[in-house]
Amino acid sequence: MKRRTFTAGLAALPFLGSSLTRAFAQDAAASLPKTYSGQKIRALASTGAAFEAMATVSRDFTEATGIAVEYVNLSYNEQYQKLILDLTSGAASFDVFNFAYQWKFEIEPYCADLANIPKEIQGAPDLALDDYPQRALEIYGRANNKLIGLPTLGDVTLFVWNKEAYKAAGLDPDAAPKTWDEVVERGAKLVSNGQFGYAMPAGKGIQTTVTWIMVFKSMGGEYFDASGAPTFASEAGVKTMKFLVEKLAAVSPPGNLAWDFPEMFNSLSTGQSGQSMMWPGAFGDLLNPKRSQVHDKIGWSPMPQASLLGGWSMGVNDASRSKDAAKLYVAWLTSPDIVRRMGLIGGAPARISALKDPELIKQAPNRPAVLAGLQGDVAEYPPIKEAEQVHIMIYDEVNAAVAKIKTPEQAASDLQGKVESFMRRRGYLKT
């Protein structure tokens, strides 16, 4: 666990980023009110460069407002457990928190509505909601017609391919596939002399679920019907299992039954596989010649047909004893100027203006593809509070099907049965 506190007395310390970017952030903070000077905000966040950037820029917020900001950074699972316990117990140990959108329906009853911050908090920046891809904003931040979060980290799956391998196989190295069938067609041409066509994870891990979700969406699948009943063994569900087992796995390396993200990344970065899915956060290593053998050979685009939305938002604890100060902070942290600055020091913007910014694109060339993915057809994780449990059911059944322990049809049927049983136990289904 990491804990970092910034107070007015610490604001003069040096920190990451150039003096130019700090001056930029200070200009953005100059008009903030000192109404809440002396109060303290505790923020719960995950770990990684993007969350470190949030803590770093907060020094300027403290300097401008006199509000101390303390960040507590935990791993994904630890953060989830800590957040749910804090909210449901009413302890209000944290005033603001980053959350994955998969959790939003579980935490919504405990979140403040952020829609009217500029009217409620004098001097708060405008939320500029039209500067976000609207479908992404809806998924990231809204639950039950309530704006409970403002995006703090934009993330969406991207398709990557080895241009040199494409060229050797007679494929256009500059053209991305438009459909999953085309991915497999190209993958078959890439299979040669120890090289494979796609780095498909089939282990009992989240990236297997990610792959299933994207293909399921491309097949026209929906998690639930109009009555709320699960439809994982629908025609689309069966087609998805068959596609993964009979087509995508067929052009992927052997031994992938234990794969998750590290193995997927390694297969692509060593040249073993010529195509893969990739999260934007991995591009720093993928384009680094010290960590990737294909650093100068990679092309990228949004996923064919639909990209899966990842990412995080920041919410305000409705029980916070410093709720107004917390709302001011969240509005400031997610304002366009501050988002841009965070992008320069490790942040992952979700705002359109930042993803189009020439300086930010120079730093991370994949940002236009991230924006295209966010603005395109996006898949999302199952929109129920127990989404994490459903993810486990999905990757268990995909793993069994790829291992030939079950037929694709049986795996789809068993997945449906597991989800139905789970939803009955949790009260979603009455019959």
Curated annotation (Swiss-Prot):
Gene3D superfamilies: Periplasmic binding protein-like II (3.40.190.10)
Compartment(s) where it occurs, according to its Swiss-Prot or TrEMBL record: Periplasm
InterPro entries reported for this sequence: Bact_solute-bd_prot1, SBP
UniProt entry tagged with the keyword Magnesium: no
GO cellular component: periplasmic space
UniProt-listed Pfam families: SBP_bac_1
Main subcellular location of this protein, as a coarse class: periplasm
Endpoints of the signal sequence: 1-25
Keywords for the protein's UniProt record, in alphabetical order: Periplasm, Plasmid, Signal, Transport
The protein's role, per its UniProt record: Probably part of the binding-protein-dependent transport system y4oPQRS. This system probably transports a sugar-like molecule.
Family recorded in the similarity comment: Belongs to the bacterial solute-binding protein 1 family.
PANTHER family: ABC TRANSPORTER PERIPLASMIC-BINDING PROTEIN YCJN-RELATED, ARABINOSE-BINDING PROTEIN-RELATED
Protein name from the UniProt record: Probable amino-acid ABC transporter periplasmic-binding protein y4oP
Record lineage: Bacteria, Pseudomonadati, Pseudomonadota, Alphaproteobacteria, Hyphomicrobiales
